[in-house]
Protein backbone atom coordinates (compact mmCIF):
# COMPACT_ATOMS: atom_id res chain seq x y z
CA UNK A 1 0.00 0.00 0.00
CA UNK A 2 1.26 3.45 -0.93
CA UNK A 3 0.36 5.56 2.06
CA UNK A 4 -0.86 9.14 2.01
CA UNK A 5 2.36 10.07 3.82
CA UNK A 6 4.51 8.46 1.11
CA UNK A 7 2.54 10.28 -1.58
CA UNK A 8 2.87 13.60 0.24
CA UNK A 9 6.65 13.15 0.38
CA UNK A 10 6.72 13.09 -3.44
CA UNK A 11 5.67 16.75 -3.53
CA UNK A 12 6.67 18.22 -0.17
CA UNK A 13 9.47 17.96 2.38
CA UNK A 14 7.87 16.42 5.48
CA UNK A 15 8.98 17.80 8.84
CA UNK A 16 8.11 16.39 12.28
CA UNK A 17 6.73 18.91 14.77
CA UNK A 18 7.65 17.41 18.13
CA UNK A 19 10.01 17.33 21.07
CA UNK A 20 9.23 13.61 21.46
CA UNK A 21 12.14 12.51 19.31
CA UNK A 22 11.63 8.80 19.96
CA UNK A 23 8.73 8.97 17.50
CA UNK A 24 10.85 10.28 14.64
CA UNK A 25 12.29 7.06 13.22
CA UNK A 26 9.01 5.52 12.11
CA UNK A 27 7.97 8.54 10.01
CA UNK A 28 11.38 9.31 8.46
CA UNK A 29 10.98 13.11 8.29
CA UNK A 30 13.66 15.24 6.65
CA UNK A 31 13.65 17.98 9.31
CA UNK A 32 12.16 18.55 12.76
CA UNK A 33 10.77 21.57 14.59
CA UNK A 34 10.46 22.29 18.30
CA UNK A 35 9.02 25.10 20.38
CA UNK A 36 8.80 25.86 24.12
CA UNK A 37 5.43 24.13 24.44
CA UNK A 38 6.69 20.94 22.78
CA UNK A 39 9.82 20.82 24.94
CA UNK A 40 7.73 21.40 28.08
CA UNK A 41 5.41 18.58 27.03
CA UNK A 42 8.35 16.25 26.36
CA UNK A 43 10.17 16.78 29.66
CA UNK A 44 7.01 15.86 31.55
CA UNK A 45 7.28 12.34 30.11
CA UNK A 46 9.30 9.72 31.94
CA UNK A 47 11.34 8.96 28.82
CA UNK A 48 12.77 12.48 28.70
CA UNK A 49 12.95 13.33 32.36
CA UNK A 50 16.59 12.15 32.57
CA UNK A 51 17.61 14.71 29.93
CA UNK A 52 16.12 17.49 32.04
CA UNK A 53 17.66 16.18 35.26
CA UNK A 54 21.11 15.71 33.70
CA UNK A 55 21.07 19.19 32.18
CA UNK A 56 20.16 20.74 35.53
CA UNK A 57 22.76 18.64 37.33
CA UNK A 58 25.55 19.42 34.84
CA UNK A 59 24.98 23.15 35.17
CA UNK A 60 24.22 23.50 38.85
CA UNK A 61 24.72 27.05 40.03
CA UNK A 62 24.03 28.57 36.61
CA UNK A 63 21.03 30.75 35.85
CA UNK A 64 17.77 29.15 34.80
CA UNK A 65 18.06 30.81 31.39
CA UNK A 66 21.50 29.27 30.94
CA UNK A 67 20.08 25.84 31.76
CA UNK A 68 17.10 26.21 29.40
CA UNK A 69 19.42 27.02 26.50
CA UNK A 70 21.42 23.86 27.23
CA UNK A 71 18.20 21.85 27.47
CA UNK A 72 17.07 23.08 24.05
CA UNK A 73 20.42 22.12 22.56
CA UNK A 74 20.28 18.72 24.29
CA UNK A 75 16.95 17.99 22.61
CA UNK A 76 18.10 19.41 19.29
CA UNK A 77 21.25 17.31 19.35
CA UNK A 78 19.30 14.11 19.98
CA UNK A 79 16.83 14.97 17.22
CA UNK A 80 19.64 15.57 14.72
CA UNK A 81 20.92 12.04 15.33
CA UNK A 82 17.63 10.76 13.90
CA UNK A 83 17.05 13.00 10.87
CA UNK A 84 19.18 13.90 7.85
CA UNK A 85 18.19 17.56 7.78
CA UNK A 86 17.67 20.48 10.12
CA UNK A 87 16.21 21.14 13.53
CA UNK A 88 14.48 24.40 14.51
CA UNK A 89 15.22 25.78 17.97
CA UNK A 90 13.20 28.72 19.25
CA UNK A 91 14.36 31.97 20.81
CA UNK A 92 12.51 32.79 24.06
CA UNK A 93 9.18 34.36 23.07
CA UNK A 94 9.67 37.00 25.76
CA UNK A 95 12.28 38.54 23.44
CA UNK A 96 9.76 38.95 20.61
CA UNK A 97 9.88 42.76 20.79
CA UNK A 98 13.63 43.12 21.42
CA UNK A 99 15.70 42.98 18.25
CA UNK A 100 19.16 43.08 19.82
CA UNK A 101 18.48 40.49 22.50
CA UNK A 102 16.95 38.21 19.87
CA UNK A 103 20.10 38.58 17.77
CA UNK A 104 22.27 37.83 20.80
CA UNK A 105 20.22 34.77 21.70
CA UNK A 106 20.31 33.45 18.14
CA UNK A 107 24.09 33.77 18.06
CA UNK A 108 24.36 32.07 21.45
CA UNK A 109 22.22 29.10 20.38
CA UNK A 110 24.32 28.59 17.26
CA UNK A 111 27.55 28.73 19.30
CA UNK A 112 26.19 26.06 21.63
CA UNK A 113 25.32 23.80 18.71
CA UNK A 114 28.73 24.35 17.13
CA UNK A 115 30.40 23.55 20.46
CA UNK A 116 28.48 20.25 20.35
CA UNK A 117 29.93 19.53 16.91
CA UNK A 118 26.85 20.50 14.90
CA UNK A 119 27.24 22.82 11.93
CA UNK A 120 25.04 25.89 11.71
CA UNK A 121 23.65 24.67 8.38
CA UNK A 122 21.70 22.03 10.34
CA UNK A 123 20.02 24.52 12.68
CA UNK A 124 17.22 27.02 12.13
CA UNK A 125 16.72 29.74 14.73
CA UNK A 126 13.00 30.29 15.33
CA UNK A 127 11.89 33.87 15.85
CA UNK A 128 8.43 35.36 16.20
CA UNK A 129 7.32 37.26 13.07
CA UNK A 130 7.08 40.61 14.83
CA UNK A 131 8.74 43.64 13.25
CA UNK A 132 11.54 43.28 15.79
CA UNK A 133 11.91 39.55 15.19
CA UNK A 134 12.11 40.09 11.44
CA UNK A 135 14.82 42.70 11.88
CA UNK A 136 16.76 40.25 14.06
CA UNK A 137 16.47 37.62 11.33
CA UNK A 138 17.81 40.09 8.78
CA UNK A 139 21.00 40.51 10.81
CA UNK A 140 21.40 36.82 11.64
CA UNK A 141 20.90 35.74 8.03
CA UNK A 142 23.74 38.03 6.94
CA UNK A 143 25.95 36.20 9.45
CA UNK A 144 25.07 32.82 7.97
CA UNK A 145 22.61 31.97 10.76
CA UNK A 146 19.46 30.63 9.13
CA UNK A 147 16.12 31.66 10.60
CA UNK A 148 12.65 30.09 10.76
CA UNK A 149 10.03 32.80 11.22
CA UNK A 150 7.20 31.50 13.36
CA UNK A 151 3.84 32.80 14.62
CA UNK A 152 3.08 33.97 11.11
CA UNK A 153 -0.57 34.61 10.26
CA UNK A 154 -0.64 37.15 7.42
CA UNK A 155 0.73 38.02 4.01
CA UNK A 156 2.35 41.21 5.27
CA UNK A 157 4.37 39.23 7.82
CA UNK A 158 5.38 36.79 5.09
CA UNK A 159 6.35 39.57 2.69
CA UNK A 160 8.47 41.30 5.33
CA UNK A 161 10.23 38.03 6.20
CA UNK A 162 11.06 37.39 2.54
CA UNK A 163 12.42 40.91 2.05
CA UNK A 164 14.58 40.40 5.15
CA UNK A 165 16.06 37.27 3.57
CA UNK A 166 14.73 34.76 6.11
CA UNK A 167 15.55 31.16 5.27
CA UNK A 168 12.07 29.87 6.04
CA UNK A 169 8.65 30.89 7.32
CA UNK A 170 6.08 28.87 9.27
CA UNK A 171 2.55 30.14 8.52
CA UNK A 172 0.12 28.67 11.06
CA UNK A 173 -2.79 26.91 9.35
CA UNK A 174 -4.65 25.50 12.34
CA UNK A 175 -4.65 28.62 14.48
CA UNK A 176 -6.08 30.64 11.59
CA UNK A 177 -8.73 27.94 11.16
CA UNK A 178 -9.49 28.09 14.90
CA UNK A 179 -10.05 31.85 14.80
CA UNK A 180 -12.45 31.83 11.88
CA UNK A 181 -14.33 28.80 13.17
CA UNK A 182 -14.82 30.53 16.52
CA UNK A 183 -15.98 33.72 14.80
CA UNK A 184 -18.64 31.90 12.78
CA UNK A 185 -19.77 29.80 15.73
CA UNK A 186 -22.86 27.72 14.92
CA UNK A 187 -22.77 28.95 11.32
CA UNK A 188 -19.50 27.13 10.65
CA UNK A 189 -20.01 24.31 8.17
CA UNK A 190 -16.98 22.04 7.95
CA UNK A 191 -18.04 20.65 4.59
CA UNK A 192 -18.33 24.14 3.13
CA UNK A 193 -15.74 26.06 5.15
CA UNK A 194 -13.06 23.36 5.40
CA UNK A 195 -10.93 21.62 2.79
CA UNK A 196 -9.83 23.93 -0.01
CA UNK A 197 -11.94 26.71 1.54
CA UNK A 198 -10.25 26.46 4.93
CA UNK A 199 -9.04 30.00 5.80
CA UNK A 200 -5.70 28.65 7.05
CA UNK A 201 -5.15 26.67 3.87
CA UNK A 202 -6.05 29.68 1.77
CA UNK A 203 -3.61 31.86 3.71
CA UNK A 204 -0.68 29.52 3.07
CA UNK A 205 -1.67 29.11 -0.58
CA UNK A 206 -1.69 32.89 -1.00
CA UNK A 207 1.72 33.26 0.69
CA UNK A 208 3.23 30.43 -1.38
CA UNK A 209 1.88 32.01 -4.57
CA UNK A 210 3.23 35.44 -3.59
CA UNK A 211 6.71 34.05 -2.96
CA UNK A 212 6.87 32.13 -6.22
CA UNK A 213 5.40 34.99 -8.26
CA UNK A 214 8.03 37.45 -7.03
CA UNK A 215 10.90 34.96 -6.98
CA UNK A 216 11.69 34.90 -3.27
CA UNK A 217 14.04 32.14 -2.11
CA UNK A 218 12.51 31.96 1.40
CA UNK A 219 11.02 28.52 2.02
CA UNK A 220 7.35 28.15 2.98
CA UNK A 221 6.63 25.56 5.67
CA UNK A 222 2.97 25.18 6.58
CA UNK A 223 2.53 24.53 10.31
CA UNK A 224 -0.03 24.08 13.08
CA UNK A 225 -2.39 21.58 11.49
CA UNK A 226 -5.65 20.34 12.94
CA UNK A 227 -6.65 17.80 10.26
CA UNK A 228 -5.07 15.68 7.55
CA UNK A 229 -7.24 17.46 4.97
CA UNK A 230 -5.46 20.74 5.77
CA UNK A 231 -2.19 18.95 5.05
CA UNK A 232 -3.21 17.27 1.81
CA UNK A 233 -4.74 20.51 0.52
CA UNK A 234 -1.22 21.98 0.73
CA UNK A 235 0.59 19.10 -1.00
CA UNK A 236 3.36 20.73 -3.01
CA UNK A 237 4.17 23.39 -0.43
CA UNK A 238 7.94 23.58 0.09
CA UNK A 239 7.70 21.95 3.52
CA UNK A 240 4.96 20.97 5.97
CA UNK A 241 5.67 20.43 9.66
CA UNK A 242 3.30 17.86 11.11
CA UNK A 243 2.61 16.52 14.61
CA UNK A 244 3.19 12.79 15.27
CA UNK A 245 -0.53 12.03 15.60
CA UNK A 246 -1.28 13.47 12.17
CA UNK A 247 1.81 11.81 10.69
CA UNK A 248 0.40 8.52 11.97
CA UNK A 249 -2.99 9.20 10.38
CA UNK A 250 -1.32 9.92 7.05
CA UNK A 251 0.79 6.78 7.44
CA UNK A 252 -2.34 4.70 8.06
CA UNK A 253 -4.27 6.19 5.14
CA UNK A 254 -4.30 5.01 1.52
CA UNK A 255 -6.14 8.14 0.35
CA UNK A 256 -4.87 9.53 -2.95
CA UNK A 257 -2.84 12.70 -2.45
CA UNK A 258 -2.62 15.01 -5.47
CA UNK A 259 -0.31 17.97 -5.83
CA UNK A 260 -2.16 21.21 -5.04
CA UNK A 261 0.65 23.79 -5.12
CA UNK A 262 3.37 24.20 -7.73
CA UNK A 263 5.87 26.96 -8.53
CA UNK A 264 4.91 27.10 -12.20
CA UNK A 265 1.22 27.65 -11.49
CA UNK A 266 2.02 30.25 -8.84
CA UNK A 267 4.21 32.28 -11.19
CA UNK A 268 1.20 33.02 -13.38
CA UNK A 269 -0.65 34.72 -10.51
CA UNK A 270 -1.33 38.45 -10.50
CA UNK A 271 -0.84 39.42 -6.85
CA UNK A 272 0.24 42.95 -5.99
CA UNK A 273 3.49 43.49 -4.13
CA UNK A 274 2.95 44.28 -0.44
CA UNK A 275 4.46 47.43 1.12
CA UNK A 276 6.63 46.37 4.05
CA UNK A 277 8.24 49.49 5.49
CA UNK A 278 7.73 49.64 9.26
CA UNK A 279 4.67 51.89 9.31
CA UNK A 280 2.96 49.94 6.51
CA UNK A 281 3.77 46.65 8.22
CA UNK A 282 2.37 47.75 11.55
CA UNK A 283 -0.77 49.23 10.01
CA UNK A 284 -1.54 46.18 7.86
CA UNK A 285 -0.96 43.81 10.76
CA UNK A 286 -3.12 45.95 13.03
CA UNK A 287 -5.82 46.01 10.34
CA UNK A 288 -5.98 42.20 10.37
CA UNK A 289 -7.83 41.28 13.57
CA UNK A 290 -7.12 37.57 13.23
CA UNK A 291 -3.37 37.99 12.69
CA UNK A 292 -3.06 40.57 15.46
CA UNK A 293 -4.93 38.45 17.99
CA UNK A 294 -3.20 35.19 17.07
CA UNK A 295 0.28 36.70 17.10
CA UNK A 296 -0.32 38.19 20.55
CA UNK A 297 -1.88 34.98 21.83
CA UNK A 298 0.96 32.85 20.47
CA UNK A 299 3.61 34.99 22.15
CA UNK A 300 1.68 34.83 25.44
CA UNK A 301 1.31 31.03 25.26
CA UNK A 302 4.95 30.36 24.39
CA UNK A 303 6.06 32.81 27.10
CA UNK A 304 3.83 31.11 29.68
CA UNK A 305 5.29 27.72 28.82
CA UNK A 306 8.81 29.12 29.13
CA UNK A 307 7.90 30.26 32.66
CA UNK A 308 6.53 26.79 33.47
CA UNK A 309 9.76 25.23 32.26
CA UNK A 310 11.76 27.63 34.42
CA UNK A 311 9.72 26.60 37.46
CA UNK A 312 10.34 22.92 36.72
CA UNK A 313 14.06 23.59 36.58
CA UNK A 314 14.03 25.63 39.79
CA UNK A 315 12.21 22.78 41.54
CA UNK A 316 15.05 20.40 40.63
CA UNK A 317 17.84 22.63 41.93
Curated annotation (Swiss-Prot):
Its Enzyme Commission number?
2.2.1.2
A cellular-component GO term for this protein? cytoplasm
Entry coiled-coil feature ranges: none
Under catalytic activity, the entry for this protein gives: D-sedoheptulose 7-phosphate + D-glyceraldehyde 3-phosphate = D-erythrose 4-phosphate + beta-D-fructose 6-phosphate
SUPFAM superfamilies the UniProt entry points to:
Aldolase (SSF51569)
Q: Organism's domain of life? A: Bacteria
**Which compartments is it annotated to reside in?**
Cytoplasm
What is one Pfam family matched by this protein?
TAL_FSA
Q: Which residues form the active site?
A: 126
GO biological-process terms attached to the record: carbohydrate metabolic process; pentose-phosphate shunt, non-oxidative branch
- Which proteins does it associate with, and in what oligomeric form? Homodimer.
HAMAP family associated with the record: Transaldolase_1
Annotated protein name in UniProt = Transaldolase
Tell me which species this is from: Burkholderia thailandensis (strain ATCC 700388 / DSM 13276 / CCUG 48851 / CIP 106301 / E264)
- Source taxonomy: Bacteria, Pseudomonadati, Pseudomonadota, Betaproteobacteria, Burkholderiales
Amino acid sequence: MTTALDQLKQYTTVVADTGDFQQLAQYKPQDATTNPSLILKAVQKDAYRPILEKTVRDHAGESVGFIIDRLLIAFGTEILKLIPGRVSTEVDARLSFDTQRSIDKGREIIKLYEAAGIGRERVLIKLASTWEGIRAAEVLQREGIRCNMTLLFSLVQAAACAEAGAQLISPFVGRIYDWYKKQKGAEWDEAKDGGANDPGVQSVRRIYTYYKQFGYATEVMGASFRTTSQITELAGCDLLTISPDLLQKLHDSAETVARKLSPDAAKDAQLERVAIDESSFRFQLNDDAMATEKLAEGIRLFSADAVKLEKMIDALR
